[in-house]
A protein has these predicted regions:
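Short Cys/His-based metal-binding microdomains
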Residues: 68-119, 124-125
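Short amphipathic alpha-helical interface patches used for protein-protein assembly/oligomerization
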Residues: 64-66, 101-106, 150-162
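Helix/loop segments that flank and initiate small ligand/metal-binding modules
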Residues: 1-84, 149, 215-217
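Short flanking/linker segments adjacent to small metal-binding domains or redox-active Cys/His motifs
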Residues: 133-161
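Short amphipathic alpha-helical segments and their helix-coil junctions
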Residues: 26-41, 117-134
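Short amphipathic alpha-helical segments embedded in low-complexity Lys/Glu-rich regions
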Residues: 69-71, 93-95, 164-169, 187-194
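C-terminal helix/juxtamembrane-tail motif
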Residues: 190-217
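Short secondary-structure subsegments characteristic of cysteine-rich extracellular domains
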Residues: 164-181
Length: 217
């Protein structure tokens, strides 16, 4: 029996509802957890970014609010000046987050005009199953990479006294997106149609020319 089969068997025999389900219900209501978990498997590149999103989803990321709940004092404010640092503030409401999300939203709405604007639930938990039926996979991964880029800038501020710049965060995000798109281009050499649909967003992010790829961002 494989490790995967053993783990699946144990889950069936002793299923426990993850703590995050109860943690976030008073704030965001009943969420689409199966869809959230599935989005962590869309890309196996940049695993550290996926791990960060997993911590965010479970509410165990060591942001300022969580550190304060452990009794830590003399913590810096957020780089925007607000005291405290909730996950929603850091990744959605903060002016830096809003500026970078503005660029992401333009891409998203260009690819899927009939989908709703990005809300906190999208940023923290990804897309619902219904939305995923219309949204190319690359956008679920872009949200993961977006949070990773914001987190890197946040850590540079708290541990290196380097105030974040929108242009630097955007450059980091674009570089990570290009890397992932190119990796999936090489991985899907025998299924270009799936690549064009899910990873180039039907030509919005990249175009295929024979065996070469032109990334447009």
């Amino acid at each position: 029996m494989t490790v995967k089969a053993s783990y699946a068997f144990l889950l069936e025999q002793s299923f426990v509802v993850p703590h995050c389900v109860w943690k976030w219900r008073p704030v965001y209501g009943d969420l689409y957890w199966d869809a959230t978990w599935s989005q962590f498997t869309f890309s196996n590149f940049l695993r550290t970014a996926v791990d960060l999103s997993w911590k965010i989803t479970h509410g165990v990321l060591h942001n300022l609010d969580r550190l304060a709940s452990f009794g830590y004092t003399n913590l810096k404010n957020c780089y925007c000046g607000q005291s405290g640092e909730s996950l929603e503030h850091l990744f959605y409401s903060c002016p830096l987050a809003q500026s970078v999300l503005g660029w992401v939203s333009v891409l998203f709405l260009s690819a899927v005009p009939d989908c709703p604007s990005l809300r906190p639930r999208h940023v923290l938990f990804g897309f619902s199953s219904e939305e995923l039926s219309r949204v190319p996979k690359v956008f679920a991964v872009i949200l993961i990479l977006y949070k990773w880029s914001i987190w890197l800038a946040r850590n540079d501020y708290h541990f290196g006294d380097r105030r974040p710049c929108v242009d630097d965060v955007l450059a980091s995000l674009k570089a990570h997106i290009c890397f992932v798109v190119r990796c999936h281009f090489r991985k899907s050499w025998n299924d270009r149609r799936a690549f064009v649909k899910h990873w180039s967003a039907n030509g919005l992010l990249a175009s295929v020319h024979g065996d070469s790829l032109l990334v447009k961002i």
